[in-house]
């Protein structure tokens, strides 16, 4: 997936799922299934329910995404 093809949106983590997956509610009300990007996993950044995050969505599958940033 090329970097210029992604759609970046903000959302809130609703629940934590197994295998580092999260259910995220976007600002527009949609719910997506998101996994953690490699840099966040590498630096052991914890993501908990209620955290505000930035999610990258592929234009081909808008139900899945990648968490790229957790706001402080």
UniProtKB/Swiss-Prot annotation:
Protein keywords: Cytoplasm, Initiation factor, Phosphoprotein, Protein biosynthesis, RNA-binding, rRNA-binding
Record Gene3D superfamilies: Nucleic acid-binding proteins
Keyword set includes Protein transport: no
InterPro entries the record matches: NA-bd_OB-fold (IPR012340), RNA-binding_domain_S1_IF1 (IPR006196), S1_domain (IPR003029), TIF_IF1 (IPR004368)
Protein family according to the UniProt entry: Belongs to the IF-1 family.
Subcellular location per the Swiss-Prot or TrEMBL entry: Cytoplasm
GO CC, one annotated term: cytosol
Highest taxon of source: Bacteria
Organism: Geobacillus thermodenitrificans (strain NG80-2)
Name under which the protein is recorded: Translation initiation factor IF-1
Chain positions found as Phosphotyrosine: 60
Gene Ontology MF terms: ribosome binding; rRNA binding; translation initiation factor activity
Stretches assigned to the S1-like domain: 1-72
Function, in words: One of the essential components for the initiation of protein synthesis. Stabilizes the binding of IF-2 and IF-3 on the 30S subunit to which N-formylmethionyl-tRNA(fMet) subsequently binds. Helps modulate mRNA selection, yielding the 30S pre-initiation complex (PIC). Upon addition of the 50S ribosomal subunit IF-1, IF-2 and IF-3 are released leaving the mature 70S translation initiation complex.
């Amino acid at each position: 997936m090329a970097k210029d093809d992604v759609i970046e949106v903000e959302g809130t983590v609703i629940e934590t799922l197994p295998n580092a997956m999260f259910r995220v509610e976007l600002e527009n009300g949609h719910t997506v299934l998101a996994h953690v990007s490699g840099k966040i996993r590498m630096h052991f950044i914890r993501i908990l329910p209620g955290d505000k995050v930035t999610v990258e969505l592929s234009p081909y599958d808008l139900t899945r995404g990648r968490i790229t940033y957790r706001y402080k």
